[in-house]
Design a protein with these regions (language model features):
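Anionic, Ser/Thr-rich low-complexity intrinsically disordered regions
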Residues: 7-10, 175
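Alpha-helical transmembrane segments of integral membrane proteins
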Residues: 4-7, 46, 73-79
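Long, highly hydrophobic alpha-helical transmembrane signal-anchor segments
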Residues: 41-74
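Hydrophobic alpha-helical transmembrane segments of multipass integral membrane proteins
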Residues: 13-16, 52-53, 57, 78, ...
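N-terminal signal-anchor/start-transfer transmembrane helix
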Residues: 11-26
Length: 187
């Protein structure tokens, strides 16, 4: 079996999921024309980051002939499965309020259950885990490292922007005051 072909197939599947997320998000924004979108200038960089998540590992694996390492793949796959489980839980919890854009919810739509009972931004934790682990399925460590660093820069700004927007809602401020951003009790 050609592990590179399987890896490229996984990247293709992730690309389709990302495209579906953008389509769903646009439809939700059209359904709420009054919605406040808080970070229009940052969004193109996020799109570029996620395009890079598909393109860079593929180029690294093919161009630099990264070998398939079963132990590394197994560890990366375990992280990816955990991240996917957290994503499903997060999206089921937040429901129709989820969007790829920073959209201020209605004041009565603040979510405090599911993973939001422990951290403010479970979906960003998912993205951190995905960006770190997806390239490592086939040893693309340069992609994992460089994309993780870029993601840290993007998320540091995006989280501040999102929290500034959500802090306009007293219910969000009160509910999230004692919760860490990404890791319960730590960060």
């Amino acid at each position: 079996m050609d592990t590179r072909a399987v890896f490229l197939g996984v990247l293709g599947l992730v690309a389709l999921v990302r495209l579906a997320e953008v389509i769903v998000s646009r439809a939700r924004l059209r359904a709420r024309p009054e919605a406040l979108v808080a970070e229009p200038a940052l969004f193109p960089l996020m799109v570029l980051l996620h395009v890079g998540l598909i393109a860079l590992p593929a180029l690294e694996v093919l161009g630099l002939e990264r070998p398939f390492r079963p132990a590394l793949c197994a560890a990366a796959a375990a992280v990816l499965v955990a991240a996917t489980a957290l994503r499903v839980w997060t999206l089921r919890t937040i429901g129709r309020a989820w969007n790829v854009r920073v959209v201020v919810p209605d004041p009565d739509a603040v979510v405090t259950s599911g993973p939001y009972a422990w951290i403010r931004h479970p979906n960003y934790l998912v993205v951190i885990l995905e960006i770190a682990s997806l390239p490592l399925l086939h040893g693309a460590w340069i992609s994992a490292l460089s994309l993780s660093l870029l993601n840290a820069c993007v998320l540091s700004r995006r989280i501040r922007t999102e929290e500034a927007a959500l802090s306009q809602l007293p219910a969000w401020r009160e509910a999230m005051a004692d919760r860490k951003r990404l890791i319960p009790g730590l960060l």
